[in-house]
Amino acid sequence: MSGRTLLLSPPSLSSQPERLNGILQSYDRKTTDLQMLDRLILGVVNLPDAAYSRIIILAGEEDSISESSKLTTRETFSHIARSLQKGGYICSQHEQQGQAFDHNEAVLVGLIPTDNGKFVKPDIEDMRAVPLRLGRKKHDKTISSNLAEPVRNHQASPTVAQDQAEDGFRYSSGRNIVTASAHETSDNEIIDEEDLLDGSELAAPIIQPPECRPKAGRRRRACKDCTCGLAQKLEEEDAMRRHAADKQLGAMKLSHGDLAEVDFTVQGKVGSCGNCSLGDAFRCEGCPFIGLPAFQPGEEIRLLNDDIQL
């Protein structure tokens, strides 16, 4: 079969360029691609669908395929199988069946094993459904007809048929076969949920269950599916507390007199990187001098009328 070839190499083989080049020389470089298994697992590389006629998993150190077998997980192997063309196959470098990947994983993704250790992707379009005609014995047909005889001869009484017809069931004439329509509904069966409770019931106070009542020394907690109103009440209390805390911890406003002089170069106040004086490009994320221009170490910085003066 003519087509492109994909070589999947374990990461240990990348440290042996001479051996890797020797393997590549045995394949046509114009129609051969090389990918690393670890990059495929991490999602750095995405293989195109139905692009290769054969995929070969290379051996690692000392011609061992155990490393490749550990890296080919179910998700990775499924992605590799999707990149095969119909009729293409996947195998190990030495065509040793069962060493480069698991048999079960190959079968689960739809590949068919062969005698030479290759797993072939079948051409589903060539497969057709074949009807199976199962013959029945004449004796069984006779028994079935005899069993159905009393049922056909049995007639439903008119009273029963009339009563059950009023319940929404229909009977075929002359037989006791019930055919009920699941889609037939009456308008009377639809109940408006707004009519279930009247005004007096809605105005009645909610009785709190004993398990929802607060215990001494503990904060009340609502049930997971609370219906007594405790969960809504606790949410309102928490919202009020957060609003009060945000109001107290509002943004601090400085007057014009408070901005007379601020020295940012206090001795001992430096960032963890030690590059605070070089500018924001060299400062770490938590540096106290972020936003200030570059300055000389020990230089005094003043803020007058919101303007930085060195």
Swiss-Prot record:
Designated gene of the protein: dre2
Cell compartments where the protein resides: Cytoplasm; Mitochondrion intermembrane space
Record region (Linker): 131-203
Names of the cofactor(s): [2Fe-2S] cluster; [4Fe-4S] cluster
GO cellular component, one term: mitochondrial intermembrane space
UniProt-annotated binding residues for [2Fe-2S] cluster: 212, 223, 226, 228
Record-linked Pfam families: CIAPIN1, DRE2_N
Keywords: 2Fe-2S, 4Fe-4S, Cytoplasm, Iron, Iron-sulfur, Metal-binding, Mitochondrion
Gene3D superfamilies (UniProt xref): Fe-S cluster assembly protein Dre2, N-terminal domain
Principal localisation: cytoplasm
Its job: Component of the cytosolic iron-sulfur (Fe-S) protein assembly (CIA) machinery required for the maturation of extramitochondrial Fe-S proteins. Part of an electron transfer chain functioning in an early step of cytosolic Fe-S biogenesis, facilitating the de novo assembly of a [4Fe-4S] cluster on the scaffold complex cfd1-nbp35. Electrons are transferred to dre2 from NADPH via the FAD- and FMN-containing protein tah18.
Residues that coordinate or bind [4Fe-4S] cluster: 273, 276, 284, 287
Swiss-Prot/TrEMBL GO biological process terms: iron-sulfur cluster assembly
Stretches for region Fe-S binding site B: 273-287
Region (Fe-S binding site A): 212-228
Protein name as catalogued: Fe-S cluster assembly protein dre2
Motif Cx2C motif 1: where in chain: 273-276
Stretches the record annotates as N-terminal SAM-like domain: 1-130
Organism expressing this protein natively: Aspergillus clavatus (strain ATCC 1007 / CBS 513.65 / DSM 816 / NCTC 3887 / NRRL 1 / QM 1276 / 107)
Annotated family: Belongs to the anamorsin family.
Subunit composition and interactions: Monomer. Interacts with tah18. Interacts with mia40.
